[in-house]
Amino acid sequence: MSEEVNRPEKEYSASSIQVLEGLEAVRKRPAMYIGDIGEKGLHHLVYEVVDNSIDEALAGYCTDIEVTINEDGSVSVRDNGRGIPTDYHEKEGRSALEVVLTVLHAGGKFDKGSYKVSGGLHGVGVSCVNALSTLLIAEVHRDGKIYRETFSKGVPTSKLEIVGECSDRGTTITFKPDGEIFTHTTEYKYEILSNRLRELAFLNKGIQLTITDKRVKDEQGGYLSETFHSKDGLKEFVQYLDATRGEPIIESIIYLDTEKNGVPVEVAMQYNDSFSENVHSY
């Protein structure tokens, strides 16, 4: 005998359908974009900004990336790439910089001529960081001028301004994560970020990555800081990983670097006498 289930009747009509504008969707469901809103998601914000700089390096336009944990808990990521474009975007009716920072799926990686390879969240990364930050400052050194624009929770709080002149080029993104989103913690851990940058240095040989923590000073009164640079890339990475995993059975590292159908493949491996295997893929 079936038993009738009494459910309170709720109206389900066109008025029930919500359309989230701009970056509202990111703030409404942040875990969909950065994985979670705990410690892992918090640090992922930094990874997304760094990945933009890595894209510039992979394209051959960037050699140095600096990550700074500031005294107020914000993070700055600076590179010496070409600088995010600041000219007027005809379709969007505003600067390209503002489009990149406020529109999902906006970026140079969708243009085949701008990037051959790229990382990050496929065009949503930096805009997500902006949406989940109480403050984001974008500073671009490009074409002899310094451009600056500020944002809060994904919304511009200033117009794009020229604040000076320069002889260098590059982009600096400074952001402070929103405590309303990251309710567990908004404090960055130096070890987590330094491990990530060390890994990126191995994966992208020739690029210099520096991390500085302005919250901590060493015995000499300077800030805690490390610089990572790898000449041999994956070969050095394998040596680093195997340093505490027993004696190598074969001294030389097996290494392959090739390309097929436009897809680059790089492999480095070494046999040692440890009990278990250790495989990393990217």
Question: How does the language model describe each region?
Answer:
Residues 42-51, 94-110, 194-195, 234-247:
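A short, contiguous, amphipathic alpha-helix enriched in charged residues
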Residues 63-69:
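A conserved short beta-strand within the histidine kinase catalytic ATPase domain
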Residues 212-282:
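GHKL/Bergerat-fold ATPase module in large chromosome/replication-associated machines
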Residues 40-63, 125-132:
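Conserved ATP-binding N-box helix of the HATPase_c
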Residues 2-15, 73-96, 107-232, 237:
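GHKL-type ATPase core
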Residues 19-27, 70-71, 164-174, 269-282:
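Flexible hinge/switch segments at interdomain interfaces of large molecular machines
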